[in-house]
Amino acid sequence: MSEPLIQLKGIERRYQSGEQEVTVLHPLDLTIEAGEMIAIVGASGSGKSTLMNLLGCLDRPSSGQYLFRGQDTATLDALSLARLRCHHFGFIFQRYHLLPHLNAAANVEIPAVYAGTSRAERQARSQALLTRLGLSDRSHHTPSQLSGGQQQRVSIARALANGGEVILADEPTGALDSQSGKEVMAILKELHAQGHTIILVTHDMEVASHADRIITLKDGRVQEDSGRKPAAVPVTPTAAPAGKEGVGHDWDRYREAARMALHAMLAHRMRTFLTMLGIIIGIAAVVSVVALGQGARAKVIDQINAMGTNTIDIFPGKDWGDEKAASIQTLNKRDLDALLGQPYLEGASPQIAAPGQLRYRNKTSSGSIVGVGNDFFRVKGMKLTNGRLFDERDIQNRAAVAVVDGKTIESLLGKQDPVGQVVLVGTLPVRIIGVVEEETGFGRSSQSVNVWLPYSAVMSRLISQNHFSQLTIRVKDGVQPALAEQAAIELLTQRHGVKDFFTFSSDSIIKSVEKTTATMTLLVSAIAVISLIVGGVGVMNIMLVSVVERTREIGIRIAVGARQSDILQQFLIEAVMVSLLGGMLGVGVSLFIGLLFSLFVESIQMHFSLFSILMAFGCSSLIGILFGYLPARNAARLDPVEALARE
C-alpha cells in the first residue's frame, strides 16, 4: 500500500486571546491520499480555514503531527516550509488575491520566480496555462480589467505554475456569479481528473457536492467524514520546469524585486519624491561643496604657480612680524653665489625693494620698485612679451635699465611702444628694455605698477645698501621642494653661524590652502550628512508605511512560495532604489548648480570629480541599506495567515 500524501495525527491548534487560551481545532486525525478531491465544510468559526492554513503550511499546529509524504513538517525550518509551499501547493482564494499592479501573465509567473525557473521558461508556462484556461487574449490585462471569473481563472493558473500537486481552494466560488462559479468548479474537476489533489474549503454544500469526499467540521472537531470513494489510479500532474540555483536564480530574484520596487514607487510618485527630498538635498550639498572646494583650491594653486612654481623665498628674521628683521643684514651676494652653485637649484635671485615714485613727462605714479637678478624672471616663471630681459653684463655694469609690466605701460606711457622710453625712477633716469606679463599670482593685485631694475643698480644708485631684502630660489624639476628647502636652510645656517632667517615656499602655501579647503569641506559635509540622516529616516518611515499598506501582498507572496529572505530582499532593494534615485537626482541638481555657477561667476569654476560622485552613490546606497533594513525585516517576519486576512 502506498504512503498517504497527507496525514494529520492528533493535530490541535490553540491561540492566545488575552489571558485565555482558545482552542480552534481540537485533536483530529485525517488522511488524504494523492489524487483525492475533498471538500471541508462547516459553518463560520468551525475551524475549516484554520485547517486549510495548516494543510498549506502557512501555520503550524500547537500539538500533533502533520506528515507530508511521510515527512514530519514540525522538523522543517522556515526555508524548507517555503520550498514545500512553492513546489507542492497551489492556493486559490475567495477574493482571488492577485497583485493589482501586475498583469495576468506576471501574476501567474510569481510562484515560478521563487522556484528559480528561468524567465523564458516561466513566461512560456504562464502563457500556456492562461491559454488552457481560456485567457490567452487577457494575459496583459491587470486584475482591474478582468471580471471576477477571469480573475479566479488567473488565480487557478497561478496555483498550477509550479505543478500544483495539491490545490487548496478557499471558497473558490464565493465571490462569483453562478455561471462563473460553475466554470471554476468544472476546471477544478478537470484538474482532479488529471491527477491533482484538490482540497475545497467551503460552507456551500452545492460546491462540496462536486467532491468525492466531504469532511464536516463543527466547533473544531470532525463531525462527519463521508469516507474515500474508489477512484482510478491518479495521474501524476505536469510539473513545472526544473528550477535552478546560483547566480542565475539570484539574478531573477533581484530583477523581480527591482521591478516590484519600481511599481511601488510609481504608484505613489509624490510620496516617493518627498521621501527622496532629504537625500537629494544632502547629496547635492556634499557634491557641490566638494566641487566648489576643488575649484577654489585649483584657483589658488594656479595663482601660486603664477608666482613661480617650486619657489622658496628666504627672508631675514625669525618669522613674519619679527621686529629685529630690519637690523639683520646677513643675506648678501656671497649667499647668492653659494646658492647658485647648488645642484638641486635651477636658479636664484635677490630682491631689494626701493622707495620712490615713477615719472614720465608730466605723469606720476606710485608703484613697486624692486632690484632683482637676471634669473628673477625665470625663477618666477614670468614671460617676456616685448624687448629683452637683464643679463649678467647689466648686473655687473649697474645699468640704469628697467623691465616693466603692462600696468606700468598703461599708467605712464599709454599706447606708445615702451621699449627705449626713459622714465624717472625716484631720482634715477632709467631706460625701459623689456615688458613682461602682468603678475596676477597669489597675493598680488593686477592693479599694481611694477618696475624691475638690476639689483646692483638699486643698491648703488638708489639706496645705499649692501645686503638683500629677500632671496628667491627655484628648485629643479624632479627634486622634492621640502628636501631642497631643508638643504638651503642648512647651507645658509652654516654660512651665518646662526639661523637668522626664515623660509616661505609655494609648497607650504598649497598645503595650507589644502588644509583650509579640507576643513571647510568637512564642516559643510557634516551639515549635509545631517540632511542625509534625516532623508534616511524619511526612507525608513515611508518603508514602514509601505509594509503596512502591502501586508496582504506579502501574505500572497509567502503563500505562493516566497521565503523570508525573498521578502527581506524585495523591501531592502526598494529602499536602496529610493535612495539611489535620490542620489542620482542629487548629483543632477549639483551639476545644474555648477552650470548656473559657471554662468554667473567667472573667477572660480566648480570641479566635479568622479570620486565625489561615486561617493555620493555609495552614501545613498548605504542609507538605503541601513534605514531600509528594519522595515524589510518587519515585512519578512509577518505571519502569512494574519497578512492574508488583512484588508
UniProtKB/Swiss-Prot annotation:
GO biological process, any: response to antibiotic
MF terms in GO: ATP binding; ATP hydrolysis activity; transmembrane transporter activity
This enzyme's EC code(s): 7.6.2.-
All copies of domain ABC transporter, residue ranges: 6-244
Superkingdom: Bacteria
Membrane topology recorded in Swiss-Prot or TrEMBL: Multi-pass membrane protein
Keywords: Antibiotic resistance, ATP-binding, Cell inner membrane, Cell membrane, Membrane, Nucleotide-binding, Translocase, Transmembrane, Transmembrane helix, Transport
Compartments in which it is found: Cell inner membrane
Name of a matching Pfam family: MacB_PCD
Membrane spanning stretches: 273-293, 527-547, 581-601, 610-630
Sequence segments annotated as region (Disordered): 223-247
Composition bias, Low complexity: 230-242
CC terms in the record's Gene Ontology section: plasma membrane
UniProt main location, coarse: membrane
Record carries keyword Translocase: yes
SMART domains: AAA (SM00382)
Binding site for ATP: G42, A43, S44, G45, S46, G47, K48, S49
Purpose of the protein: Part of the tripartite efflux system MacAB-TolC. MacB is a non-canonical ABC transporter that contains transmembrane domains (TMD), which form a pore in the inner membrane, and an ATP-binding domain (NBD), which is responsible for energy generation. Confers resistance against macrolides.
Subunit description: Homodimer. Part of the tripartite efflux system MacAB-TolC, which is composed of an inner membrane transporter, MacB, a periplasmic membrane fusion protein, MacA, and an outer membrane component, TolC. The complex forms a large protein conduit and can translocate molecules across both the inner and outer membranes. Interacts with MacA.
Protein family per UniProt: Belongs to the ABC transporter superfamily. Macrolide exporter (TC 3.A.1.122) family.
Protein name: Macrolide export ATP-binding/permease protein MacB 2
Native organism taxonomy: Bacteria, Pseudomonadati, Pseudomonadota, Gammaproteobacteria, Aeromonadales
